[in-house]
């Protein structure tokens, strides 16, 4: 079994490779087409080889009143004026103490700008980390598949709270060489959100990370004479030019957005309706909100987002680049300079795929191609249900 060395960069876009001479020296490069969503969408696609319409993960939060971690707190809907940031922090902290620990990357996040009366309607999609057994309920991940075949692997850089790449990866030394070694580099996304990926701060970081990858590659190369090597990212980044206050937009129409069950996140606003009148009202209000549109069945089909129920919304409003909502469940977005989660059709949404071996023809590959490509390198069978392709030109 030929060993495989891989590096994952969160949010690295193709244009940024000009600042990374080592990675850019590999001639076999493709643009990575993103999923329409954020990390909670992208990671299951790349680890399972199937699109969201199969793995069923699109947003961090879903409509699930029965299993909501806040189901016990329905009485708090009567707080009225006492429903403020302080009471929300308290309820969130208290609930996390009551429940078993959620080890997912996002855990159970605070819904900062969401009234407490709506918290019991929602549950988090993920309950464990990407590499833990059974992360996805319907499909095995790459980590699950390798465990099933008794193939060992090593993950470096994914441990939350253990420091950044220069701590976890920089201090790593190769001992036993496993069939798969996976380095996870997450700071490009953070720097891009904070400064923009074309900023001096992020460019300096990219150069440092390029040197780090080069050092690890050369250390591995000294130990292993023949191995497959590939690098990928899940999406790109797009500079923000404006912020949209959807709360103010509803007020201009004489309504409060919280008259309706909703979640506002980055560039998406999702709604659940209790009757037809609510749907009519929301559709009317959103009808003149510039810069976005309501996702239709055509979008759901095109981007593999067809779901079996309304867990992600009865209506999903998408705000296109280069804008984001200014007041969301995550905060106020004042420090955000760049964003992702836009249509995969936009070139700025693209990630990267780089390898040391020739790739199949075409300009783009997809996140669902990562799993079958990895399994093929390891000599393991690719399951029939997988949506992706093996990317090696000489495959088979």
Regions found by a protein language model. Name each.
Residues 4-9, 14, 19, 208-248, ...:
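Metal-dependent active-site segment of extracytoplasmic phospho-/sulfohydrolases and closely related
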Residues 14-17, 54-57, 67-68, 162-164, ...:
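Short catalytic/ligand-binding loop motif for oxyanion handling, primarily in non-cytosolic enzymes
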Residues 3-5, 178-182, 228, 314:
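Residue-level preference for the first positions of well-ordered beta-strands
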Residues 226, 235-274, 396:
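Acidic/histidine-rich catalytic neighborhood
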């Amino acid at each position: 079994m030929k060993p495989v060395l891989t590096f994952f960069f969160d949010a690295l876009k193709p244009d940024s490779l000009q600042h990374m001479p080592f990675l850019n020296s590999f001639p076999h490069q493709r643009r990575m087409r993103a999923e329409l969503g954020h990390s909670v969408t992208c990671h299951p696609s790349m680890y399972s080889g199937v699109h969201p319409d199969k793995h069923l993960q699109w947003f961090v939060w879903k409509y699930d009143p029965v299993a909501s971690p806040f189901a016990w707190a329905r009485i708090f809907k009567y707080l009225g004026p006492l429903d403020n940031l302080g009471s929300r922090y308290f309820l969130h902290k208290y609930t996390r103490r009551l429940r078993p620990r959620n080890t997912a990357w996002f855990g159970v996040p605070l819904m900062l700008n969401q009234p407490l009366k709506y918290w019991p309607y929602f549950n988090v999609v993920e309950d464990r980390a990407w590499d833990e057994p059974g992360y996805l309920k319907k499909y095995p991940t790459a980590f699950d598949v390798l465990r099933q075949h008794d193939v060992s692997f090593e993950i470096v850089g994914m441990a939350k709270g253990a420091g950044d790449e220069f701590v976890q990866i920089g201090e790593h030394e190769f001992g036993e060489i496993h069939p798969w070694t996976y380095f996870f580099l997450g700071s490009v996304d953070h720097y891009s959100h904070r400064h923009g990926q074309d900023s001096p701060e992020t460019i300096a970081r990219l150069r440092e990370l390029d040197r780090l990858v080069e050092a690890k590659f050369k250390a591995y190369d000294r130990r292993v004479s023949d191995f497959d090597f590939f690098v990928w990212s899940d999406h790109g980044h797009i500079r923000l030019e404006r912020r949209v206050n959807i709360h103010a937009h509803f007020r201009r129409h004489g309504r409060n957005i919280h008259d309706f069950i909703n979640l506002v996140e980055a560039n998406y606003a999702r709604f659940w309706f209790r009757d037809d009148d609510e749907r009519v009202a929301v559709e009317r209000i959103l009808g003149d909100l510039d810069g976005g549109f309501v996702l239709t069945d055509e979008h759901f089909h095109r981007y593999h987002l067809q779901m079996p129920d309304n867990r992600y919304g009865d209506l999903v409003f998408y705000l296109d680049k280069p804008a984001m909502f200014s007041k969301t469940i995550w905060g106020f977005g004042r420090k955000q300079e760049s964003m992702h989660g836009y249509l995969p059709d936009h070139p700025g949404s693209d990630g990267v795929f780089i390898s040391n071996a020739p790739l199949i023809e075409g300009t783009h590959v997809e996140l669902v191609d990562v799993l079958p490509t990895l399994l093929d390198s390891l000599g393991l069978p690719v399951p029939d249900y997988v949506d992706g392709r093996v990317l090696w030109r000489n495959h088979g």
